Amino acid sequence: VLREPLESGKIMISRVSAQTEYPANFQLSAAMNPCPCGYLGDKRCVCSLDQIRRYRNKISGPLMDRIDLHVQVSAIDNHNLLNQSTAPKGESNDQIQKRVCAARDRQLKRQGKINNQLTSKEIRQLCPLDEQLRDLMNKAIDRFGLSARGFYRVLKVARSLADLEASEYPKS
């Protein structure tokens, strides 16, 4: 149900007497545990490899292929959770907002739309791969089994990261 609107920004509702198309342009944020018990990689994990495989297969490959970023987040140990003074200091929300707005403005000025809306041809023109990036992408394709769709999504994310850094081109 999510694949079509994620790809096209529209959803078609079909009933016996008619079909209606609705706009469905949205950003999907999702989270899931790494395994059914949630403790994968920890001695508390009780899941078998088969249970983990079945759990992860609940989300279809084509849907996973349409999710741009996959991030594994490690658990915070109790000492660090209780002792906030050891937490790394990052950018403030205001600083992040300014960088994101500047990156978005940069995209609109350069190409008249945000990077997520670029076609494959457009992203290839705006995200040229030098030899080092080409080697890195080849390794990523081999290691993660990227589809063509996945390849272009990586380029769009790379272009967006370059925009956040106010860089003309993505860097490896």
Describe each model-derived feature in a short phrase.
Residues 2-172:
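Basic, amphipathic alpha-helical bundle interface domains used for macromolecular binding and assembly
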